[in-house]
Design a protein with these regions (language model features):
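Short, solvent-exposed positions on alpha-helices
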Residues: 230, 292-295, 367-371, 375, ...
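C-terminal capping/lid segments that line or modulate ligand- or cofactor-binding pockets
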Residues: 272-293, 389-442, 485-493, 497-503, ...
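Active-site neighborhood of glycoside hydrolase catalytic domains
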Residues: 346-382, 387, 391-467, 499-503
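Glycine-rich phosphate-binding loop at the start of an alpha helix
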Residues: 233, 346, 353, 527, ...
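Aromatic-residue-lined binding/catalytic grooves and analogous aromatic/hydrophobic interfacial grooves
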Residues: 1-340, 347, 358-360, 378-381, ...
Length: 580
């Protein structure tokens, strides 16, 4: 954590702060004793650094203390008066936050965790710099520029990480020296050019009126029922900003907390959940013109197609690759401990694979299609062909099978999570087979696997409509344990999949009945569940319903800084569909 504290400030007036989404620059300002103090900050991807500039207008009254801290064990060096270096090793092991433990964070000297380093330099104009107790002390300055960069020992999921902080320290030193020589204006210019290249591609405007109210007051008015079309636009652009901030070429994809986790034991371990969250995060990228930010997702799925081969082979005795519901930075693909209703779900890779195809659909990049998307789709298809089982009725089914995180009642009214061929399994396999056929057509491929796909598609069961008139969650007409369950998995074939067509009136009505029945038993205040409803109703052509849930999301499921209570960014693509 970077800390800076103003000293000698005791009469603050007119404090303001803002984030400009068009240039990704933060500013704040206040007055003290007739002197205006202004802070400007931005994170530069080209420079891999944070720059923060503080100015005292027409005055040499800027007195500051600067220091670094970390919840992780560390050591601090102050090599020069104007520089601080914080280094250390991550814990050797951390128990997830949902596991009770007297000693959840372990440091093992024999097996140290990943190394890391953070380097801070202060460049001062019109003042003096002194060395404090692990602090930089600045007096009588007119301007102070902070340069901050960080490195860690992570290389790749399949390579050992660095445990020596010295490697990270040296990388940080070199970068800070380069940045010091480059200068603020050049770094800023590069940042503006880089950010604009991805942000400027889309703009949404619903009203020409500009609100001057602070965000918390705008939200308060909106929650009272006041109309604010500008707030809807702001939320749309804010979500695009968040995606750009946390997912660019060379980074990991957006996970359950994005890059905004501050805890050693974060909720859900800051992992990736493949039964909705990871995919929903990236629904917006194609429709909202953020293909650059889609690259980490595509690369991640390709890695999983390699790492998941062992899971397919040893745990499912199938060719190809498989991913279950919980994935970490080391590309863990097997089931985790816990209830089968969530822990056992070998269909994650299939969903990820079908979504990866969107990259080609929005770019027409044949080389990526041939070198990455086709190989991982081919192997995902091979897994499905090996996993499907032929039953006595001549149809192919998955078994055992779960419907993500929901359960059903058996004939004795017991709660059960495992059966055969959930509707989600069926929809995913239909989608994957369709995508594979389309890719083969584009690349002029005709092989044995393609012929098996065509034969197997004809043997898949039809979607089932139950006695209550809605699409069934399982191939059998079970009653759900949780009628208001937050997942909408059974209608994947309608959205985000494509196997349920608008022309099939009976299935369309069954999907709508499923959604309406779910609405009766839930408030949909979980952010990503509400986002799913926005998308579903928009695709069903009911703009009023979609807008209702979009406004419900803003009223009940976001914090005052617009962070979602349950983070995936799925509402953005729904909003685009509502207003297009």
């Amino acid at each position: 954590v970077l800390h800076y504290r103003f000293t000698g400030i005791d009469q603050i007036q007119g404090y303001k702060r803002s984030l400009n989404l068009k240039n990704a620059i933060y500013t704040s300002s206040f007055e003290n004793k007739n002197v205006c103090y202004k802070t400007t900050a931005f994170l530069s991807k080209p420079s891999n650094a944070l720059l923060l500039k503080i100015e005292a207008k027409n005055s040499h009254s800027l007195d500051l203390e600067l220091w670094l801290s970390s919840e992780v064990k560390n050591h601090i060096k102050q090599e020069e008066m104007d520089s601080i270096l914080l280094s250390g090793n991550a814990p050797s092991h951390v128990q997830p936050n949902y596991i009770d433990s007297d000693n959840p964070i372990l440091y093992d000297k024999e097996h140290p965790g990943m190394a890391f380093s953070i380097y801070l330099r202060a460049m001062v104009k019109g003042g003096t710099v002194e060395r404090g107790n692990k602090k930089i002390i600045i007096k009588n300055a007119s301007t102070v520029l902070f340069l901050l960069t960080a490195e860690d020992g992570y290389k790749r999921y399949d390579l050992p990480f660095a445990t020596s902080p010295k490697i990270c320290e040296e990388l940080c030193r070199r970068r800070i020296e380069d940045l010091s020589m480059k200068g603020y204006r050049r770094i800023l210019k590069e940042h503006l050019r880089d950010y604009a290249s991805v942000y400027k591609n889309v703009y949404l405007q619903l009203s020409k009126r500009r609100s001057t109210l602070p965000l918390d007051k705008r939200l308060a008015r909106f929650r009272e029922g006041k109309t604010d079309l500008g707030l809807l636009c702001l939320f749309f652009h804010y979500n695009r900003y968040l995606m750009i901030a946390c997912s660019r070429k060379g980074t990991e994809p957006a996970n359950l907390q994005g890059i905004w986790n501050e805890n050693i034991r974060p909720v859900w371990s800051s992992n990736w959940t493949s039964n909705i969250n990871l995919e929903m995060n990236y629904w917006l990228n194609g429709p909202c013109n953020l293909i650059d930010s889609f690259v980490p997702f595509l690369d991640f799925v390709y890695d999983l197609s390699l790492a998941g081969r062992e899971t397919a082979k040893t745990q499912y005795h199938c060719p190809g690759w498989a991913v279950n519901h919980n994935i970490d930075i080391w590309r863990h693909t097997g089931p985790v401990g816990g209830d089968a209703k969530y822990a056992y779900w070998p269909m994650g890779g299939i969903w990820l694979c079908t979504q990866a195809f969107l990259y080609y659909q929005y770019t027409n990049d044949l080389s990526v299609l041939k070198e990455k998307i086709y190989p991982m789709t081919y192997d995902a298809v091979r897994f499905c062909l090996g996993w499907l089982q032929l039953r006595e009725d001549g149809r192919l089914y998955t078994a055992p099978s779960t419907s993500p995180e929901n359960m059903f009642k058996d004939k004795d009214n017991h709660a059960c999570g495992v059966s055969y061929m959930s509707t989600m399994d069926l929809a995913l396999i239909k989608e994957l087979f369709s995508v594979y056929e389309e890719i083969c057509d584009i690349l002029k491929v005709d092989n044995e696997v393609l012929q098996k796909v065509k034969l197997s598609t004809a043997k898949l069961p039809a979607y089932q409509i139950g006695k209550r008139g809605k699409i069934q969650e399982w191939i059998q007409d079970f009653e759900e344990v949780d009628k208001g369950h937050r997942h909408f998995s059974p209608i994947f074939g309608f959205h985000p999949g494509h196997s349920i067509k608008n022309t099939d009136k009976a299935l369309m009505e069954a999907c709508q009945k499923f959604v309406e029945d779910k609405e009766k038993h839930t408030k949909a205040e979980i952010g990503w569940s509400c986002a799913w409803l926005i998308n579903i109703w928009a695709k069903l052509g009911n703009g009023n319903k979609a807008r209702f849930y979009y406004e419900e999301l803003l009223r009940h499921s976001v914090y005052d800084n617009l962070f979602d209570l349950h983070p995936p960014l799925g509402e953005t693509t729904g909003e685009r569909e509502v207003f297009q």
